[in-house]
């Protein structure tokens, strides 16, 4: 009789452990885990076509990871733009980006490192000095592509580096050319996850 009771207790404990483990697995496999975040950083860009155009901005963003793979963010930025010839312009803008977690299937979810692809559209505004009377206020639309590498500092705080490329119509007329403007970009910042 005692053997039967001991066997029954062992089986019940094993079953309870198995059920608990299955609950943990199901919780971790849930593909719909939304997560809000805000971020801030410094963004710089330099023309890739040799036109000596550089830009430095403060950038803030807010977004949502819809699940463990796809997210979106809204960005705003403001800063300064330097053109060849010693001219500069105030710049500000806003954009929308789609984020894709490239590490979801290749790394542990609790990994301290994350790599995401970024694709988006950005609307910009440039306020030029009086030397450019025909284009004192210029609006632009740009496409941007990049990769974001993020490292967890704490459970909620991440540091990220985001290199990328920005493509847009040329927005200034100092040399009469009509080239598309292509710039390499780099953003360094921090993200707070809610």
Predicted regions: what they are:
Residues 47-56, 83-89, 174-180:
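Solvent-exposed loop/turn segments connecting transmembrane beta-strands
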Residues 21-65, 71, 126:
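Short glycine/proline- and aromatic-enriched beta-strand/turn motifs that initiate or cap beta-hairpins
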Residues 64-142, 151-155, 191-192:
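Gram-negative (and chloroplast) outer-membrane scaffold detector with strong preference
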Residues 9-16:
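Bacterial N-terminal signal peptides
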Residues 93-96, 162-169, 175-193:
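Detector for outer-membrane/organellar transmembrane beta-barrel domains
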Residues 36-38, 56-60, 92-96, 115, ...:
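Hydrophobic, lipid-facing positions within transmembrane beta-strands of outer-membrane proteins
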Residues 1-7:
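Bacterial N-terminal signal peptides that target proteins for export
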Residues 5, 19-39, 102-115, 194:
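Outer-membrane beta-barrel biogenesis signature
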